[in-house]
Amino acid sequence: IGKALVHSNNPIKIGIILTPDYNPFVLELLEGIQTAQKEFSAFGLEVITKMMTTLEPAEQLSIINELVDMNVSGMAVFPLDDPQIFSRVNHLIENQMAVITFNSRVEGIHHLSFIGQDHYKGGRTAAGLLNKICPPGTQVGVIISSRNLSCHQDRLSGFQDKLAEVDSNFKILD
C-alpha cells in the first residue's frame, strides 16, 4: 500500500477536527497527529488538522464543509452534540466518506468506528471514589466545560446515577 500511495498522483487526504486547545488532552492528540503526519507524509498521505476555537456547532459545521471542499477522503471528528452536526456527518457517510469519531460517542452519528473511553463509567467511578472519601451530606460542585460535548454529559450522568444508587445524601450544587 505504501508504494502505491507514493506513486499515486492523488494523495490521500484525511481531515481531523479537534476541539479548542485549552484542554491538555487535545494538546496530546495534536502532538500525536503531528508525529504521525511526519511519519506518513513520505507515503503520500496528507493530514489536515483543524482546531476549533469555540465549542459552537456552527463553527464545527463550517470546518466540516471546509474539509469537504478540500476533497478529504476521510475524516476524524471530535463531534459536538448537535443535530446539524449529526445530519452533515451522516450525509458524508451515506456518500461513502470514511468517518471515525473520537472521545465523544454520539448516538446520532453512524460512524465507521469510535475511539475513546466509556465516559458514563468514568463518571460512576468518580462518584464511587467520592463516596468512599467524603462523609454523607457533602456538598459537591461539578464543573463541565460544555454541554455541547456528549462526553461531558455522559460523565455527569454516570456520576449522578452512581450517587443516587449509593444513597450517600450528597448534594450536587448548581
Outline where the language-model segments fall.
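Periplasmic-binding protein-like
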Residues: 16, 71-79, 98-102, 141-142, ...
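An alpha-beta-alpha
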Residues: 14-18, 33, 126-174
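Signal peptide-proximal N-terminal region
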Residues: 34-49, 164-170
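Hydrophobic alpha-helical
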Residues: 67, 74-93, 159, 173
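Flexible loop/hinge segments that line or gate small-molecule binding clefts
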Residues: 82-121, 132, 139
